[in-house]
Every structure is written in C-alpha cells, then in structure tokens.
C-alpha cells in the first residue's frame, strides 16, 4: 500500500462531535477525511442524513454564544452560497439547527478537512492500517478512525409523524421542552422505560399536564 492511499484520520459521522474532531485534527495538520453520510431516503427516514440530528431541529436555545438576534449577515459571510441555498431563510430568532451545523462543517473545511458524502458500511479493525468499506464501493485505509455516528431517535413510525417533526412532535424533551410551542400545553410521552419516565418528569416543569402512554400494564422503568 502506498503512503498516498493511506489516510491519517478518517472520521465517520457529521454531527457536532464529528466536526469538532475534524477541526482539531485539521489544525494539527493531520488532513482528516470525513464521511458525512449519504443523502438517501433510507437515511432520511432513519434521521441519519449529513449534519446529524441537530440539523433536524429548528430553534437551538441552549448552545452558548448564539443569543437571539439576526444572524443573516454573519451567515452570508461565513458560508459559501451553495451551502446557504440548502437552508431555510434565517428568521432572526437566534441560531437554528441547520445553521449551527453548517457553521461547524464550514469551520472544519476552512482548516483543510476533506468531506465525502457517502456512508461507511463496514470497518475492519483487526489490523492496522484499518480498512473501511464505502457504500458506493471501494476501500479506504486509515491509521486512525474516529466513529462519531451519534444516536438515532426512536420514532413511532406513524405515517403522520414525519409531517409534524419540529411542529409539535419531538424526540428530545431536554432539547425542546422549554420552547414556547410546548409551554403550558398538554403533552404526551410515549414509552415506559427509564428514558420515557425521565423525559415525562422533566416536562412537568413546562407543561400544563403530561400524559405517559405505555403499551404494557406496567412500566419497565
């Protein structure tokens, strides 16, 4: 294997952790390569499109450094036109999920990170250099691999669910519970495990009433 075909660092995943790792690696002159994920219907339904779950979130109120205000001029100067065209117009309420993720991506790219819009299907960690198999075909060899694939929300799979994401349907109470659209409303949490009960308890701070719906006759929590 030639040195030209061997990567120093390959990062799998394009959420906040992936871009932060890429920025650090790029500033350290390691020339990282990020596989940000493929743009496919399967990934869209699973919530694993490029830029991670945060890109599916509207308002982001709990990330330091972005108070409410008009960021339109800053976004115009910080992001290339082709990336700005992929986002909804800035509404002026602070930073949105897609905007925050595009800024993280651009910061990593500015320092020399290379990005491939494809999935990694398999990694052989049995020997170094490691071998990564691309979904589109072909292999990548790397001295180091950072897996930053994050988590996937556990949606119900209802036909109408997709239509109401970020319009009243959420998969994260801590992320969204304090937003105005949920305050002083009757809210429903579906599930009976530890996470469901923790989320329901948290939402009592904001909701007028919280209903916990579980398919069994007793909670697993």
What do the PLM-derived regions correspond to, one by one?
Residues 145, 149-172:
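Glycine-rich beta-alpha-beta "Rossmann" dinucleotide-binding loop(s) and their flanking helix/strand
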Residues 5-7, 134-144:
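Core beta-strand elements of the Rossmann-like FAD/NAD(P) dinucleotide-binding domain
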Residues 2-6, 11-40, 49, 165, ...:
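Rossmann-like dinucleotide/flavin-binding elements
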Residues 45-47, 54, 156-160:
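Conserved catalytic-core motifs of eukaryotic protein kinase domains, centered on the activation segment
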Residues 51-139, 219-221:
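N-terminal Rossmann-like dinucleotide/flavin-binding domain of flavoprotein oxidoreductases
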């Amino acid at each position: 294997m030639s040195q030209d075909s061997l990567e120093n660092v390959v990062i799998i995943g394009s959420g906040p952790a992936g871009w932060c790792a890429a920025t650090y690696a790029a500033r350290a002159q390691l020339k990282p390569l990020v596989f940000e994920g493929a743009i496919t219907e399967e990934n869209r339904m699973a919530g694993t499109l490029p830029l991670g779950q945060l890109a599916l979130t509207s308002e982001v109120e709990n990330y330091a450094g972005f108070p409410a205000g008009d960021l339109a001029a800053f976004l115009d100067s910080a992001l290339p036109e082709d990336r700005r065209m992929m986002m909804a117009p800035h509404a002026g309420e602070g930073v949105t999920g897609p905007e925050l993720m595009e800024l993280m991506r651009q910061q990593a790219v500015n320092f020399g990170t290379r990005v491939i819009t494809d999935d990694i299907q398999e990694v052989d960690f049995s020997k170094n250099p490691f071998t990564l198999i691309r979904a589109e075909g072909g292999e990548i060899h790397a001295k180091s691999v950072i897996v930053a694939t994050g988590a996937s929300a556990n949606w119900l799979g209802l036909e109408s669910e997709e239509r109401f994401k970020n319009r009243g349907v959420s998969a994260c109470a801590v992320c969204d519970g304090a937003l105005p659209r949920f305050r002083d409303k009757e809210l429903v949490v579906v599930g009976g495990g530890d996470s469901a009960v923790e989320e329901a308890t948290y939402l009592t701070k904001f909701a007028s009433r919280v209903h916990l719906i579980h398919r069994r006759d007793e909670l697993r929590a």
